Amino acid sequence: MHVVSTKQMLNNAQRGGYAVPAFNIHNLETMQVVVETAANLHAPVIIAGTPGTFTHAGTENLLALVSAMAKQYHHPLAIHLDHHTKFDDIAQKVRSGVRSVMIDASHLPFAQNISRVKEVVDFCHRFDVSVEAELGQLGGQEDDVQVNEADAFYTNPAQAREFAEATGIDSLAVAIGTAHGMYASAPALDFSRLENIRQWVNLPLVLHGASGLSTKDIQQTIKLGICKINVATELKNAFSQALKNYLTEHPEATEPRDYLQSAKSAMRDVVSKVIADCGCEGRA
């Protein structure tokens, strides 16, 4: 097994009526939990990293780790650039071996978004790299980027078709009421908008900001065309809360291999639940 593109993963999900979870990883323990759990459940998963994650860990290190774990567990894995904005940064990582990219130019006016995305698509497709882009903009914070709720806006279904056709993207991230981070109360997702987008666009659709969504809402979005579910904050929260609890109960603890086990156990529960919600167990 080896590092693969997300294109076939998401096309399979679109045909099969399930979604592939993309887990944002932040350290070795997160990677171990995601891959081990996915392999045990025979579920396809995507290892995602923001620019900050790649800077923290190093592109070559992440690629080597994903490749080694794919071979160790005999499980296909995709490593994905999440919310990358700079062409030169994307190009460098693609040349290093990354095979899945999200170019996020959603903050730009429509025409400029198309232009920026098409530049990335034209480059990436030369290397058989799949490209995701976003139309509409989610509120909340992702990496170092903060989008105020007032500046967030939903995806326009008619524009979505024009955007997809003009850019040649392989998947489309949509804005239907989710946000980055956890929710103080359950969000009201615009399912009718999602259904309209699917009628206009015959591409795998992507849902960002899925941390904290109910199983019912996740499964409804999948019925309406979502093929990739992004989860980041829920993993971070599980990790940090379990770690805090352990160190509070065991203030004398100094061995990382001991106290990190509680954090891994908490994350394992999250990963298992997300895989179940996505309906992708046994699909790898």
From Swiss-Prot:
Is Ligase set as a keyword in this record?
A: no
Keywords in UniProt for this one? Galactitol metabolism, Lyase, Metal-binding, Zinc
What residues make up the catalytic site? 82 (proton donor)
Please tell me where Zn(2+) binds in this chain.
83, 180, 208
Cofactor entry: Zn(2+)
Instruction: Give GO cellular component annotations, separated by semicolons.
Output: cytosol
Give binding positions for dihydroxyacetone phosphate.
181, 209-211, 230-233
Family, similarity comment:
Belongs to the class II fructose-bisphosphate aldolase family. TagBP aldolase GatY subfamily.
Q: What does this protein do?
A: Catalytic subunit of the tagatose-1,6-bisphosphate aldolase GatYZ, which catalyzes the reversible aldol condensation of dihydroxyacetone phosphate (DHAP or glycerone-phosphate) with glyceraldehyde 3-phosphate (G3P) to produce tagatose 1,6-bisphosphate (TBP). Requires GatZ subunit for full activity and stability. Is involved in the catabolism of galactitol.
Q: How does it assemble?
A: Forms a complex with GatZ.
> Could you identify this protein by its name?
D-tagatose-1,6-bisphosphate aldolase subunit GatY
